[in-house]
Regions:
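Hydrophobic alpha-helical membrane context
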Residues: 16-17, 205
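Sec-dependent N-terminal signal peptides
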Residues: 6-14
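Extended beta-strand/loop cores of jelly-roll/beta-sandwich
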Residues: 2-3, 17-134, 141, 242-261
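Functional-site microenvironments in short loops/helix caps that host divalent-cation chemistry
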Residues: 32, 97-238, 246-249
């Protein structure tokens, strides 16, 4: 009887700890359990290990970013230095603190035309950071029902279809976007997203001296590898990131935040 009661007590403590852990999860963030994945070219690549981390459920919206620039004037359209954001910064906004006549249509949509510098500043002011390329790609492998949908051709076909479409006049609200296994919305089919180390996107081996991947991607053998749907989709993202500079602002490039645990 004593042992039975002790077992129940231990079980109850475990449940309470689990509930407490769930309660302490930051609002609108989810836990992405760590693991390994193979970027780009399947067996030709070195597996990358990703630690468990937290990630925002949604990309940052125009309304959220408006609150940020209201609090931090240095990131307003008229005040930001060109070193930190080019001339297209917040291009669709009507002014420093106005989303314009279409505010109702875009307030809950992803903020775009933001630079890496401004995205990084936003996340840091929330006590967070941008996700690394490795974390973002790992989380983006998830379909609606699988943490790793690397072998699901239909899942990757959806990505290709999105990449082939022109930008819509108005991006949809973030809550109406595709929701994956982790509960993350819009990882595919909404906007491109800034990552912490975007400028190292083309180097995926364990050593930064490993430059063979660059040749694979952009030379003859790269085109052969891209015939695999999932490789082509990842290639599109890596190629896009490699074209960016930290002060660039692009019409379909937004961001979300992450956090180490």
């Amino acid at each position: 009887m004593i042992f039975h009661r002790l077992f129940l007590l231990i079980l109850l403590v475990g449940v309470c700890c689990n509930v407490q852990a769930q309660k302490s999860l930051p609002k609108n963030m989810v836990n992405v359990k760590g693991g390994t994945f193979v970027p780009l070219y399947g067996s030709d690549s070195i597996p990358v290990k990703v630690k468990t981390f937290l990630m925002d459920v949604y990309p940052v919206t125009n309304a959220e970013y408006l609150a940020f620039v209201n609090k931090y004037p240095k990131w307003r359209k008229s005040a930001v230095k060109k070193l930190f954001a080019d001339e297209n910064y917040l291009k669709k906004w009507d002014g420093d603190l106005s989303l314009g006549p279409n505010a109702a249509k875009i307030q809950n949509s992803p903020v775009v035309n933001v630079s890496w510098f401004s995205a990084k500043a936003y996340c840091e002011c929330q006590g967070k950071r941008l996700a690394t390329v490795e974390e973002w790609e790992y989380a983006a492998l998830a379909s609606e029902t699988k943490a790793n949908a690397a072998n699901d051709a239909k899942f990757y076909q959806r990505s290709i279809e999105w990449y082939s479409k022109p930008n819509p006049a108005y991006l949809p609200p973030v809550k109406e976007s595709f929701r994956n296994y982790y509960g993350l919305h819009g990882m595919i089919g909404l906007v491109w997203e800034w990552t912490q180390n975007f400028n190292s996107a083309m180097v995926v081996g364990e050593s930064r001296a490993d430059v063979t991947m660059d040749r694979q991607l952009f030379c003859g053998s790269g085109s052969d590898g891209a015939k695999d749907v999932k490789n082509y989709v990842a290639f599109m993202r890596y190629a896009f990131r490699s074209s960016l500079k930290a002060n660039y602002t692009v019409a379909n490039l937004g961001f979300r935040c992450a956090k180490s645990i």
